[in-house]
């Protein structure tokens, strides 16, 4: 359980960093201390592949800053090694 929670938390943090990088040169839409982490949900499909589901203010701010959610896609990778977890997130153009 702790291993799963660590990977999910790492993915949420990585999402915030990827979103910030996508807005390079512009101020963040939500300050780091204002993020409601419950609005960033790590989900898995039936093959246990991770994805990010956004809710509430975070979802609205992403659409405002990045455009309609149909125009971008969040790619997630989570890895574990013993007690350590790491995640990578990329926000890419879904229309390309």
Label every PLM stretch briefly:
Residues 1-96:
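Core catalytic alpha/beta fold that binds nucleotide/phospho-ligands
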């Amino acid at each position: 359980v702790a291993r799963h929670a660590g990977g999910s938390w790492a993915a949420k943090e990585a999402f915030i960093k990827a979103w910030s990088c996508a807005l390079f040169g512009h101020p963040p839409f939500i300050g780091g201390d204002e993020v409601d982490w419950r609005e960033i949900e790590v989900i898995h499909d039936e093959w246990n592949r991770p994805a990010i589901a956004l809710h509430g203010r975070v979802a609205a701010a992403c659409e405002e800053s990045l455009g309609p959610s149909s125009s971008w896609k969040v790619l997630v990778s989570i890895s574990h090694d013993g007690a350590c977890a790491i995640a990578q997130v990329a926000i890419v153009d879904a229309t390309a």
